[in-house]
Amino acid sequence: MTITLEQFISQLDESGVISAVDIAAFQESQSPPAESAEDLGKLLVKQKKVTKLQAQLVYQGKGNRLLLGNYLILDKIGAGGMGDVYLAEHRRMERRVALKTL
């Protein structure tokens, strides 16, 4: 499934990963600006504005999976027989934690 640049920006904003305003400022600082969702995702990951996992999930239309309560999923740390472990950040306190999902 290919999504447009506008859809990608909208989903990044809706998922809480990065605001549309911040993306617009980022795009203005790029020469030339990204013209596709894939290119923008690569640039954002390269500049550490989003993680590779975040860009992939949003690109796949699964950005809603990045929010778990007050936590924003940043990256996958590991997986095992009982579930997955993610690096996450509390959205208000900005504290990083390991979250295990079963």
Predicted regions and their residues:
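Juxta-kinase regulatory segment immediately upstream of eukaryotic protein kinase catalytic domains
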Residues: 53-62
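Conserved ATP-binding/catalytic core of the eukaryotic-like protein kinase fold
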Residues: 4, 12, 45, 61-102
